Amino acid sequence: METVQPGSEKEREAIDRFKSFYQVFSAEIIKDRIRTVYAGPAYFRDGYREVTGLDNIEAYFLKSAETVHECTFDIQDVAVHEGNYYFRWVMNLTTKRWKDEPITAVGMSHVRFDQEGKVIFHQDYWDTSLVYEKIPIVGSVIRWVREQF
């Protein structure tokens, strides 16, 4: 698969577009911009789900946004190596159910862009147990396990 040309204007625009898309995670932004960021056959995976295809990614993001009160990503830096882009970020999240209990998580997105500068591969790495801890019984178990080590 051909990827965006390193050092090109398209590469810079792809990076900027990705960073801008994730500044605020909301249904409005997803609906308005996802098709400018992700390619049709894109692959996405995070700690909750693995999704292939732009329509499926959009549906997953919109479903996720339904539970969010506010979610922002502060992208700290970007590393590039042989067509792979690594975005290191801090997510600040409050859910509709737990508005008074903000979650801050450090994570990283491994991304590849196609030749048009759209995301074709996106794998997120972060500690999803920070969200699971909020669920009454599951949270108790996770906290207990953490205390054991």
Q: PLM ranges: what are they?
A:
Residues 24, 43-44, 96:
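General structural signal for alpha-helix termini and helix-helix connectors
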Residues 12, 31-83:
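A solvent-exposed, acidic/Ser-Thr-rich amphipathic alpha-helical stretch
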Residues 1-32, 36, 148-149:
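Short, low-complexity N-terminal intrinsically disordered segments enriched in polar/charged residues
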